[in-house]
C-alpha cells in the first residue's frame, strides 16, 4: 500500500514538472513571437519613415502612413508588439504626420 502511494506521488510530481516545463516553453514561444513581431514592426516603421523623408509630394506621404497606422495600431492594441523607445519616438512622429496629411486620404 505504501509503495502504491509512493508511486502515485512520483507520478503527480512528474506530471507537475511536465506542466511547469510546458508552461515555460509556451512563455518562451510567446516572448520569441513578440520579439520577432516587434522587430518586424520597428523595421516597417523605419522603412516608412525613410519613404516619407524621400517623398516628393504630400500625397505619397499620406498613403504609406495610412497603411502603417492600421498595421501598427492593430498590433499594439492586440499586444502583439512592444515598441522600444526609439521606435515609439518614430511612431509618434508618423502619427503626427498622419494627422497633418489626413485630409489627403
Identify the function of each model-found stretch.
Residues 1, 7, 51, 69-70, ...:
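Generic signature of intrinsically disordered, low-complexity, basic-rich segments
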Residues 66-105:
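Amphipathic alpha-helical binding modules
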Residues 1-41, 93-105:
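Short terminal alpha-helical segments
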Residues 22-74:
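Amphipathic alpha-helical interaction modules
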Residues 6, 32, 59, 78-81:
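Generic amphipathic alpha-helical segments used as scaffolds and interaction surfaces in large
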Amino acid at each position: 500500500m505504501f509503495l502504491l502511494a509512493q508511486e502515485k506521488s512520483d507520478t503527480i510530481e512528474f506530471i507537475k514538472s511536465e506542466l511547469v516545463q510546458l508552461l515555460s516553453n509556451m512563455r518562451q514561444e510567446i516572448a520569441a513571437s513578440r520579439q520577432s513581431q516587434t522587430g518586424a514592426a520597428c523595421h516597417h516603421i523605419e522603412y516608412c519613415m525613410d519613404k516619407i523623408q524621400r517623398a516628393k509630394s504630400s500625397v505619397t506621404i499620406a498613403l504609406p502612413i495610412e497603411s502603417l497606422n492600421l498595421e501598427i495600431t492593430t498590433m499594439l492594441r492586440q499586444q502583439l508588439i512592444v515598441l522600444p523607445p526609439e521606435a515609439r519616438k518614430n511612431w509618434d512622429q508618423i502619427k503626427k504626420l498622419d494627422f497633418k496629411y489626413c485630409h489627403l486620404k
